[in-house]
C-alpha cells in the first residue's frame, strides 16, 4: 500500500513534470483542469500534514509575505557584462582579437545564442534545491529576489536528473513574452492602472515587487545561458555541452542556439535570427557569440568588467523621425560640455524619447544640424537615443551656437588640442561639476557612502553646505536634518556611513577622486604599482606609463590632475583633516618577502568566517602570493573554508597542499 509520504512525493514529481512540459517545452501534457486537480490534492495533503511540507514543493511558488526591502547579495563569482559589436566590421575585429590572443589563425568554434532583452538573474541551487535568486546589480552586489523568482513556473524549484553538483549557480534572463505583455497592459488600461512601455521594463518591475503575490500574476519566463559558481561537481568543458546539461537537469534553455565554426557561420546565424526576430514572440536585441571551448575561454580571460571570449552582436537600433525643438548644454563631472537635442517626443523601440545626445561641436557640424530640423533618432544598442542625420531642414531653422562660457557657472570654456570635447574651466567652483564629482565620490565602487543619494548631493550643493569631497566629512546630523525628506534617524545614519567610509583602500580612494580616464581597474593598478600616495604624486609621465594598462593619455590625465593645486589641497584635506585612510600597500618583489606565501600561487575556496574573501586576498597578495580563481597543476596551495567543493576535490586529486582558514591566520601572523 502506498504511504502518505510516497503519495505526496508522487504528486510533486507529476506536477513538476507537467510544469516543465507546459512552461519550458510549451507542450502541455494534461488539461489545465487535471493540473489544478492534482495541485489541489497536494495542497490538501500538505495542509493536513504540515510536517511533510518542503520548500521545493510546487505549492510553495506563491504565498510568501510581502518584503519591506530587498536584501543585498554579494556574488561569489562576479556577474560581468559583455562588450558590444554593432556591425560586421566590429564583429570581425572581435574575432581577430580572439585569434591573436590565442596565437591561432585557424577558425574557432563559437556557441551563438539569442541576446534576450530582459533582466539578468543568478539562481543558486544547493543539493539540487533552489535556495537563492539575485539580480545582477552592479555585477558584484545584487538584490535577493528569491521569493519573486520562485513564482516563475519555468524555473524549477528542484533540479532533476543525475550528477547534480553540491552548489550550482545558473545565470540567465527573466523576460516577458510579447503576448503576455500585451494582455497585461490591456488589462491595466481597462482598469485605469499603470501600463509598461516595453516588456523589459515590465519584467524588471515585476521582479522588483516587494509583494511576490503580485509577481506571481505577471507572465514571466526564463532561459538560462551560463554558469557562475560550481562546487562539489563537474561540468562539461564546452559551453554548448553545458547548455545541454542544464536542459537535462530541467532548466529552460532557448532552442535557438548554434555551434558556428567560422565567421561566415556566425554571420549567417546573426542574419537568420534578425530575419526571424518579429516572429520569436519575445524581445531580443542581438545575438551573443561565445568561444565554445572552456580551455580557450580560460586562456582568453577577462578585461575589467567583461570576458574577452564573448561579445554581444547587437541588431541595428530602431529609428524614428522627429523635430529638434531646441539644443541645450549639459556639464558633466569632469567639465565636459555635451549638447543635448530637445525633441518633439516620439516613440522609439517602445520608449518615448524627448532628448538625444549630440556628443560635441564636431558632431553638430558633421550633421549640419539646426534647431527646427527634422532628424532621424536612433536608440544606439536600443538604449541611448542619439541623432543620426538631418532629413529635412525647416524654414527659419536656427544655428546651434556652442557656448564660450559655462552655462552653469559662467567660467570660460576651453577645448584642448587633440580632444573633441569642450570643457568648463571652473572645476569645483562649477555647481554641475561639483555635483558630479561628489556623486562619483560617494558611489558604491568609490567610497560607498550608504544613504548619500543623488538628491541629497543636489541639495547639499544647492544650499552650499558642501563645496568639495573633504567637506562631506564635516556634515553633522543637525545640518542634514535641514534637507528635504531627511529625518533625525536618516541623518544620523548618513553621518555614521561617512565615518565608516573613512576606512577604505588606496585603490578605492584613487577611483573616488574622479581622475579622467581612471576607472576601477586603472586605479587598482596604480595603487598596486606605487603603494603610497606620496610615490604616486611624485611620479612623472614616463614612470606612470610603466604601470600596466596606463598609456600616454591616461598618464597625462593623472599627472595634470595631481599638478592642479586645488586637487592637491582636497587630497590633503581628505587625508589629514577628514582622516580618510587605508591599509598600507606593500610593494615588494616576491623573492624579497620572508613569508610562507611569497611567490606561491594560492586558491581560496569555500566560505571564510574570520576574514572576508577580499580581505584575505589582499593580505595574501601583500605577502607576495598570486591569488588565482582556479586549481591547476601550477597551484601551490589551496585554502579551504567551510563547504569547500570541487576546487578542494581537484586539489586533493592533484596532490596540492591544503590548509584551513585557522592555519592561514596562523601563517599570516594572527
Curated annotation (Swiss-Prot):
Q: Provide the reaction this enzyme catalyses.
A: NAD(+) + (deoxyribonucleotide)n-3'-hydroxyl + 5'-phospho-(deoxyribonucleotide)m = (deoxyribonucleotide)n+m + AMP + beta-nicotinamide D-nucleotide
The organism's superkingdom is given as Bacteria
Q: Which residues bind NAD(+)?
A: 32-36, 81-82, 113, 136, 173, 290, 314
Q: GO CC: one term? A: cytosol
List the EC numbers from the record. 6.5.1.2
Indicate the segments forming the BRCT domain, all copies. 592-670
Q: Which cysteines are joined by disulfide bonds?
A: none
Keyword annotations: DNA damage, DNA repair, DNA replication, Ligase, Magnesium, Manganese, Metal-binding, NAD, Zinc
Protein name as it appears in the record = DNA ligase
Organism listed in the record: Erwinia tasmaniensis (strain DSM 17950 / CFBP 7177 / CIP 109463 / NCPPB 4357 / Et1/99)
Amino acid at each position: 500500500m502506498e504511504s502518505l509520504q510516497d503519495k505526496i512525493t508522487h504528486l510533486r514529481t507529476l506536477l513538476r513534470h507537467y510544469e516543465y512540459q507546459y512552461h519550458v517545452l510549451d507542450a502541455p501534457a494534461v488539461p489545465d483542469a487535471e493540473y489544478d486537480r492534482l495541485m489541489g490534492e497536494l495542497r490538501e495533503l500538505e495542509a493536513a500534514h504540515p510536517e511533510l511540507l518542503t520548500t521545493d514543493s510546487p505549492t510553495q511558488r506563491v504565498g510568501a509575505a510581502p518584503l519591506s526591502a530587498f536584501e543585498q547579495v554579494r556574488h561569489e563569482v562576479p556577474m560581468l557584462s559583455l562588450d558590444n559589436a554593432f556591425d560586421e566590421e566590429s564583429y570581425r575585429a572581435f574575432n581577430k582579437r580572439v585569434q591573436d590572443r590565442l596565437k591561432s589563425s585557424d577558425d574557432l568554434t563559437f556557441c551563438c545564442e539569442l541576446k534576450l532583452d530582459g533582466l539578468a538573474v543568478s539562481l543558486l541551487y544547493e543539493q539540487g534545491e533552489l535556495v537563492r535568486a539575485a539580480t545582477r546589480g552592479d555585477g558584484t552586489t545584487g538584490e535577493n529576489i528569491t521569493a519573486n523568482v520562485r513564482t516563475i513556473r519555468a524555473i524549477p524549484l528542484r533540479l532533476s536528473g543525475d550528477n547534480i553538483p553540491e552548489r550550482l549557480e545558473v545565470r540567465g534572463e527573466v523576460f516577458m513574452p510579447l503576448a503576455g505583455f500585451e494582455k497585461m497592459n490591456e488589462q491595466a488600461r481597462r482598469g485605469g492602472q499603470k501600463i509598461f512601455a516595453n516588456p523589459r521594463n515590465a519584467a524588471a518591475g515585476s521582479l522588483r515587487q516587494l509583494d511576490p503575490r503580485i509577481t506571481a500574476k505577471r507572465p514571466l519566463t526564463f532561459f538560462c545561458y551560463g554558469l557562475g559558481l560550481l562546487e562539489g561537481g563537474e561540468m562539461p568543458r564546452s559551453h554548448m555541452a553545458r547548455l545541454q546539461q542544464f536542459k537535462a537537469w530541467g532548466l529552460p534553455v532557448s532552442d535557438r542556439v548554434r555551434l558556428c565554426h567560422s565567421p561566415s557561420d556566425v554571420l549567417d546565424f546573426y542574419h537568420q535570427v534578425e530575419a526571424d526576430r518579429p516572429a520569436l514572440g519575445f524581445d531580443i536585441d542581438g545575438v551573443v557569440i561565445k568561444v565554445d571551448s572552456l580551455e580557450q575561454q580560460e586562456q582568453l580571460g577577462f578585461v575589467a568588467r567583461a570576458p574577452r571570449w564573448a561579445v554581444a552582436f547587437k541588431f541595428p537600433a530602431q529609428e524614428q523621425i522627429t523635430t529638434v525643438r531646441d539644443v541645450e548644454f549639459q556639464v558633466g563631472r569632469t567639465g565636459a560640455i555635451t549638447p543635448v537635442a530637445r525633441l518633439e517626443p516620439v516613440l522609439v523601440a517602445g520608449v518615448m524619447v524627448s532628448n538625444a545626445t549630440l556628443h560635441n561641436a564636431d558632431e553638430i557640424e558633421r550633421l549640419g544640424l539646426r534647431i527646427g530640423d527634422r532628424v532621424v533618432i536612433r536608440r544606439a544598442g536600443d538604449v541611448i537615443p542619439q541623432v543620426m542625420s538631418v532629413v529635412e531642414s525647416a524654414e527659419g531653422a536656427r544655428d546651434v551656437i556652442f557656448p564660450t562660457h559655462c552655462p552653469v557657472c559662467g567660467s570660460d570654456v576651453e577645448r584642448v588640442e587633440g580632444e573633441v570635447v569642450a570643457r568648463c574651466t571652473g572645476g569645483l567652483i562649477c555647481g554641475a561639476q561639483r555635483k558630479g564629482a561628489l556623486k562619483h565620490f560617494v558611489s558604491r565602487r568609490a567610497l560607498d557612502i550608504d544613504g548619500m543619494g543623488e538628491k541629497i548631493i543636489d541639495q547639499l550643493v544647492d544650499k552650499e553646505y558642501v563645496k568639495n569631497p573633504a567637506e562631506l566629512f564635516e556634515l553633522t546630523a543637525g545640518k542634514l536634518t535641514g534637507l528635504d525628506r531627511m529625518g533625525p534617524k536618516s541623518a544620523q545614519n548618513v553621518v555614521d556611513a561617512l565615518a565608516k567610509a573613512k576606512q577604505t583602500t588606496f585603490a578605492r580612494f584613487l577611483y573616488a577622486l574622479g581622475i579622467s580616464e581612471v576607472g576601477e581597474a586603472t586605479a587598482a593598478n596604480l595603487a598596486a604599482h606605487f603603494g603610497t600616495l606620496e610615490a604616486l604624486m611624485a611620479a612623472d609621465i614616463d614612470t606612470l606609463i610603466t604601470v600596466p594598462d596606463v598609456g600616454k593619455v591616461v598618464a597625462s590625465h593623472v599627472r595634470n590632475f595631481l599638478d592642479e593645486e586645488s586637487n592637491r589641497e582636497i587630497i590633503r584635506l581628505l587625508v589629514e583633516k577628514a582622516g580618510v585612510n587605508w591599509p598600507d600597500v606593500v610593494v615588494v618583489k616576491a623573492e624579497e618577502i620572508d613569508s610562507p606565501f611569497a611567490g606561491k600561487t594560492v586558491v581560496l575556496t569555500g566560505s571564510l568566517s574570520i576574514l572576508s574573501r577580499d580581505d584575505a586576498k589582499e593580505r595574501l597578495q601583500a605577502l607576495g602570493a598570486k591569488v588565482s580563481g582556479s586549481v591547476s597543476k601550477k597551484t601551490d596551495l589551496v585554502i579551504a573554508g567551510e563547504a569547500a567543493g570541487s576546487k578542494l576535490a581537484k586539489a586533493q586529486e592533484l596532490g596540492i597542499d591544503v590548509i584551513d582558514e585557522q592555519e592561514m591566520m596562523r601563517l599570516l601572523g594572527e
